[in-house]
């Protein structure tokens, strides 16, 4: 009788003599002690089990277990959920998009999310204070049923249809006042969580002055309150940071677009830098701050400067901040004028278009405490400030092995693999400023990637669906700096004439 390969390979090949048919719903485990005639056990696959119904009722666009294993972050539709070890989901934020796969990573302090058009960050914290059902009319929240926890003032409010940056500002029992206007006529499940901090503060220009705070402030947190523009965030701690600049003497011989560097003081990566925005007869009359510095000892006023041009004699009077997480001065991204009032610092932030050199990204990873991400449909990629979700404007570079665009990024063995359309290259952290990374000589490869989300870690390396100038859809594993083919002809045959740019891969351990 015929001999069927019930245990063994499973694929369809062009030739029936090479065709192993299909094995459905089993995976094999070989007893390593039985050698050539080893015993093989077949285990049924478990299939899919529904664990968590998410209220957004939309596609799950991405998931990641946060470092430490306490929480999983999942994006469903336009909402960001944090799921605890008991599989209880809590909405903690809202994206500006609702479809398409997202990239998620974290550094143990912040979760970083990219959706192709925007970038977001969530300060890792206990996400839930209360879960309840309620309706909203204008700024009035009416609670119809408390499911778990306790509702209180100074809690951020989340749920389908609730505007971002909404805070419960007053009320008790079943009637509460919220900071944003909404209309939810039918009772829906909502959840609240304590804000990161309640502030007594004022804003003048891009300086936030905090006179009282209930919690710790960090770069990347959203600031909300009466009159505060949506999307206002802390971009830098005030301590050692230049908040404002006055020209003391304008010097001579300067030209528009000259680069100016403040001399003196003790600083970290870089001193404060400027670009000349206006001159009058060679005398500087206007400056644009390009980097606010990070001083441990600030320069003495009037501060001397150097330039890339031919000008001399420009001196500046610098005002630096005092904020280190508590009261003091902080740098924000929006210029406002608001007298002292109650404001709130929130843990979830949609990063503004002014963050970094470009907006958006569709893949992100973490290396040496830098978030690294791409600029979609270009060769560019960027790195955030260390241990921060904020990106300095000049902290970016371009893949340049070939003219093809950068498609995907993965960090492996402390290095950054830039996978393009048909070529790839590897960069490493060398600690330079403003961009910490440099390309490793000899790391270029004539293999790119066919699908940006086909990258998956496997063993001590990673695999992906490759592409080069001769074709695509080989599955390869990175071996050092160069990919090695691991797919069989039969596997590749299944990908022939298929659209694979939207392929997604994942690995698991039995």
Description of each model-found segment:
Residues 1-90, 356-426, 432, 503-509:
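N-terminal beta-propeller domains
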Residues 101-126, 335-351:
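Hydrophobic or amphipathic alpha-helical targeting/insertion segments
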Residues 54-58, 136-141, 203, 207-212, ...:
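Surface-exposed ligand/attachment interfaces on beta-rich extracellular proteins
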Residues 152, 195-211, 218-224, 230, ...:
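Conserved, function-critical positions that sit in or immediately flank catalytic
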Residues 118-119, 378-379, 469-472:
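Short glycine/acidic-enriched loop and turn motifs that connect beta-strands
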Residues 364, 370, 405-510:
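Beta-sheet-dominated scaffold domains
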Residues 87-90, 284, 324-326, 344-348, ...:
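Beta-strand initiation motifs
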């Amino acid at each position: 009788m015929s001999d069927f390969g019930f245990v063994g390979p499973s694929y369809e090949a062009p030739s029936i003599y090479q065709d192993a048919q299909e094995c459905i719903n089993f995976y094999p485990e070989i007893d390593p002690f039985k050698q050539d005639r080893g015993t093989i056990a077949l285990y049924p696959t478990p299939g899919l089990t529904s664990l968590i119904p998410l209220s957004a009722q939309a596609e799950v666009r991405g998931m990641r277990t946060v470092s430490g294993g306490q929480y999983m972050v999942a994006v469903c539709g336009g909402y960001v959920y944090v799921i605890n070890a008991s599989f209880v989901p809590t909405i903690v934020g809202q994206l500006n998009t609702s479809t398409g796969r997202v990239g998620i990573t974290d550094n143990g302090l912040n979760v970083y999310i990219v959706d192709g058009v925007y970038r977001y960050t969530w300060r890792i914290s206990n996400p839930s204070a209360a879960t309840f059902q309620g309706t909203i009319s204008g700024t009035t929240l009416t609670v119809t049923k408390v499911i778990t926890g306790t509702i209180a003032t100074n809690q951020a409010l989340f749920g389908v249809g609730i505007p971002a940056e909404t805070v419960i500002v007053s009320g008790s029992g079943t009637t509460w006042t919220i900071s944003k206007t909404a209309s939810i006529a039918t009772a829906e499940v909502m959840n609240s969580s304590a804000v990161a901090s309640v502030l007594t503060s004022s804003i003048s220009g891009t300086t936030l002055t905090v006179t009282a705070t209930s919690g710790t402030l960090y770069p990347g947190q959203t600031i909300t309150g009466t009159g505060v523009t949506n999307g206002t965030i802390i971009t830098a701690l005030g301590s050692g940071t230049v908040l404002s600049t006055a020209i003391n003497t304008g010097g001579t011989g300067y030209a528009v677009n000259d680069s100016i560097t403040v001399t003196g003081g003790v600083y970290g990566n870089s001193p404060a830098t400027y670009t000349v925005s206006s001159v009058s007869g060679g005398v500087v009359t206007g400056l644009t701050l390009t980097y606010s510095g990070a001083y441990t000892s600030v320069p003495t006023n009037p501060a001397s400067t150097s330039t890339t041009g031919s000008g001399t004699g420009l001196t500046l009077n610098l005002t630096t901040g005092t904020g280190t997480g508590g009261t003091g001065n902080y740098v924000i991204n929006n210029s406002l004028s608001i007298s002292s009032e109650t404001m709130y610092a929130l843990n979830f932030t949609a990063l503004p278009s002014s963050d970094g050199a470009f907006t958006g990204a569709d893949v992100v990873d973490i290396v040496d405490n830098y978030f690294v991400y791409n600029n979609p449909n270009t060769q560019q990629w960027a790195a955030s400030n260390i241990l921060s979700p904020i990106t300095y404007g000049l902290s970016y570079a371009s893949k340049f092995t070939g003219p093809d665009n950068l498609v995907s990024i993965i960090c492996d063995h402390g290095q950054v693999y830039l996978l393009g359309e048909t070529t790839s290259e590897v960069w490493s952290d060398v600690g330079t400023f403003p961009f910490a990374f440099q390309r490793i000589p000899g790391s270029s490869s004539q293999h790119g990637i066919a699908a940006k989300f086909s990258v998956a870690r496997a063993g001590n390396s990673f695999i992906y669906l490759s592409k080069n100038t001769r074709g695509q859809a080989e599955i390869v594993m990175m071996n050092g700096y160069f990919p090695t083919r691991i797919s069989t002809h039969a596997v590749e045959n299944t990908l022939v004439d298929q659209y694979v740019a939207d392929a997604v891969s994942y690995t698991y351990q039995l």
